[in-house]
């Protein structure tokens, strides 16, 4: 029961400058990310969507009430904060008319108002979110938010860590992994079909540096509701047990044995009370 309620701390992936990213290293980082998905990100996402540890507790005996009441404070915290924080879309402007025109066109093409809202919401849920940049099929700059469940940054190990790689991946309908690894110049495709391997030699992504930005909720990369997680679970358990008590007594019958009744039907004495 306790294991279900514990959320693992976030982890920053690093690699030393003298190490290269081969398929063995990539596989290791993906495995670590998948572990983090299970021990942290999935629990935070479940909390926001209203699926709490109480839903996974062992069922009580059939004759006992077994309410599982969820009061979704996590969603309330996230939505309320983001309503105040980014309810009014971000406005970007420039005194240079040509730059202003480009910014407006870039924002409209990439639906930046929606992207920014999703980045903010995901930061509040997971403690961080990524914004990825790419060149689309029309040779224009594309921008897309990436949830931390679907990708991760690998930083160098310097005093002020800088991104060295960005990895995104997904599984197709046949449970085959497909993904992309980006460094400061190239993007490489990989797959685990017939064994983990890179596909081709990679291609220039067209950006100066690793094409991603990490946004964080705070320096610790904690969810907006993470510090209240134990209280939310305790509240859900308390209110559920209270409902169980009410149901238990509502369904109970009073049986009186050995009562002495006079000619008017008034009880004179009771030998045993049994619930």
Where are these regions (language model features)?
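Extended, regular secondary-structure scaffolds
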Residues: 130-221
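Extended, helix-rich architectural segments
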Residues: 1-141
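A generic structural signal for short, solvent-exposed coil/turn residues
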Residues: 84, 123-125, 146-147, 159-160, ...
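Extended, charged amphipathic alpha-helical segments
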Residues: 198-275
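A general structural signal for short secondary-structure junctions and capping/turn motifs
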Residues: 120-125, 157-159, 170-172, 243-247
């Amino acid at each position: 029961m306790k294991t279900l309620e514990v959320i693992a701390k976030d982890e920053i992936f690093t690699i030393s400058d003298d190490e290269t990213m081969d398929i063995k290293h990539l596989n290791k980082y993906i495995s670590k990310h998948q572990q983090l998905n299970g021990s942290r990100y999935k629990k935070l996402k479940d909390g926001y969507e209203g699926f709490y540890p109480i839903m996974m507790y062992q069922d009580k005996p059939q004759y006992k009430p077994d309410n599982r009441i969820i009061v979704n404070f996590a969603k309330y915290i996230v939505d309320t904060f983001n309503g105040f924080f980014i309810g009014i879309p971000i406005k970007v402007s420039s005194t240079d008319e040509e730059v202003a025109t480009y910014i407006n066109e870039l924002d409209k093409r990439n639906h930046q108002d929606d992207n920014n809202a999703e980045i903010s919401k995901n930061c509040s849920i997971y403690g961080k979110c990524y914004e990825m940049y790419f060149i689309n099929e029309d040779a224009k700059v594309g921008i897309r938010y990436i949830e931390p469940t679907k990708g991760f940054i690998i930083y160098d190990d310097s005093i002020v860590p800088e991104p060295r790689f960005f990895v995104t991946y997904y599984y197709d309908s046949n449970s085959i992994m497909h993904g992309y690894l980006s460094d400061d110049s190239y993007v490489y495709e990989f797959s685990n079909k017939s064994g983990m391997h890179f596909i081709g030699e990679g291609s220039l992504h067209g950006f100066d540096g690793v094409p991603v930005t990490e946004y964080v909720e705070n320096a610790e990369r904690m969810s907006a509701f993470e510090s209240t997680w134990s209280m939310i679970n305790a509240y859900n358990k308390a209110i559920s047990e209270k409902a169980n008590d009410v149901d238990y007594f509502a369904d109970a019958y009073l049986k009186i044995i050995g009562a002495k009744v006079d000619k008017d039907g008034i009880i004179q004495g009771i030998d045993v009370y049994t619930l």
